[in-house]
Design a protein with these regions (language model features):
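N-terminal Rossmann-like NAD(P) cofactor-binding subdomain of oxidoreductases
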Residues: 1-23, 163-167, 171-184
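C-terminal substrate-binding/catalytic lobe of Rossmann-fold NAD(P)-dependent oxidoreductases
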Residues: 5-148, 152
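Composition- and surface-driven signal marking solvent-exposed, interaction-prone regions
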Residues: 90-94, 159-162, 179
Length: 185
């Protein structure tokens, strides 16, 4: 739980080309992005670092991005180096206990998207991320690697509801949003 435990975080954002409802912007093949920031790479790490900076944390992050010709979900490959030794069992326990994280053994974005459509609140997965369990790896007790999917719509819906509740009820917003907890997977 110590934010100082993170030595560095590297990740690749594999973005969907466009949303299912969009009629334009689809690409015919994978397209790589550029590193627009020398320190952070793509804007994703820069945005993440800025967010964590509001909490007083100065994280060593770097990201790359690319788009693929899919309309389902973004995919994130991550590699985290930590100071304290850890294990795959410990990582899985922490992820399973985090209500904002969904765990799956499905390895296709279409399967996870379909699950959300069939079982989610109005077809949406409200969790912030869906980690693919069998992709998790711990190397030398200090390096954590894996893949996760981003349920784009549900992610922003929950964030927006949380932000509105925080604005209205800054001391009790966490209690207020618990009415949605049964919708997390």
């Amino acid at each position: 739980n110590d934010p100082n435990n993170l030595v560095e975080g590297r990740y690749v954002c594999i973005r969907r080309a466009n949303d299912l409802s969009q009629e334009t912007g689809f690409i015919p093949s994978p397209q790589v992005g550029t590193h627009t920031d020398e320190k952070y790479g793509s804007h994703h790490a820069k945005d993440s670092a800025a967010l964590f900076h509001t909490l007083g944390m100065d994280l060593n992050l770097f990201s790359s991005a690319m788009k693929v010709n899919s309309q389902y979900m973004h995919i994130l490959w991550f590699n985290l180096q930590v100071k304290e030794p850890t294990s795959i069992t410990s990582i899985k326990e922490r992820l399973y206990s985090n209500e904002r994280v969904a765990m799956t053994t499905k390895d296709l974005t279409s399967s996870v998207f379909s699950f959300g459509r069939d079982h989610g609140h109005f077809g949406r997965i409200l969790n912030q991320t869906v980690v693919v369990e069998q992709t998790l790896n711990v190397k030398n007790d200090h390096e954590i690697t894996g893949f996760c999917f981003t349920p784009q719509d549900g992610n922003s819906i929950l964030s927006s509801i949380s932000a509105a509740e925080w604005l209205l009820y800054p001391h009790s917003y966490i209690d207020k949003i618990q009415c949605l907890s049964h919708l997390f997977f």
